[in-house]
C-alpha cells in the first residue's frame, strides 16, 4: 500500500511540474508591438501597400524583430469615433531590449520614410509576459 501511495504522490508531483512547464511554454518573453492606424485623407492604396511591404521587410532589416503581421481580420472602432482606424500592424520583438533598441534604429528610420507621411493617427500597445 505504501508503494502505491508513493507512486501516486510521485505521479502527482510530475503532473504538477508538467503543468507548470506547459504554462511557462505558453507565456513567452517576447514583446508584441501592436499599432492601430488611420491614414491621412487622400492616402492612395499604393502608398499603404508600399508601407505594408516595408513592415514585412523589418525582420530582415532588424534582427530584434522576429515576426510581423499585417493582415487585420477585424478592426474595431469605438462607437462615435471621429477617426476610424483601418489597419493593424503587429511586430514581435525578441525582448524588451530589442524593442527599446529599435527606437531610432536605421531600420525604424527607413520604415518611417514610408509610414509617417501617410499616418494620420495611431495607437500603440506593447505587450509581454
Annotate each PLM feature.
Residues 31-58:
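N-terminal targeting signals for Sec/Tat export/insertion, comprising classic cleavable signal peptides
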Residues 7-17:
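Bacterial N-terminal signal peptides
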Residues 26, 45, 57-65, 83, ...:
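An amphipathic, aromatic/His-enriched active-site/gating alpha helix that lines ligand/cofactor pockets
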Residues 1-4:
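Positively charged n-region of N-terminal signal peptides that target proteins for export
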Residues 69-74, 126-128:
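A general secondary-structure junction signal
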Amino acid at each position: 500500500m505504501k508503494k502505491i501511495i508513493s507512486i501516486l504522490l510521485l505521479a502527482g508531483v510530475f503532473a504538477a511540474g508538467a503543468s507548470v512547464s506547459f504554462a511557462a511554454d505558453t507565456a513567452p518573453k517576447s514583446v508584441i508591438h501592436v499599432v492601430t492606424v488611420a491614414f491621412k485623407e487622400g492616402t492612395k492604396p499604393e502608398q499603404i501597400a508600399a508601407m505594408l511591404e516595408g513592415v514585412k521587410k523589418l525582420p530582415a532589416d532588424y534582427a530584434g524583430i522576429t515576426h510581423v503581421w499585417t493582415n487585420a481580420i477585424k478592426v474595431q472602432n469605438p462607437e462615435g469615433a471621429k477617426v476610424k482606424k483601418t489597419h493593424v500592424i503587429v511586430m514581435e520583438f525578441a525582448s524588451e531590449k530589442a524593442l527599446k533598441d529599435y527606437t531610432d534604429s536605421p531600420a525604424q528610420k527607413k520604415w518611417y520614410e514610408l509610414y509617417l507621411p501617410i499616418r494620420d493617427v495611431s495607437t500603440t500597445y506593447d505587450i509581454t509576459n
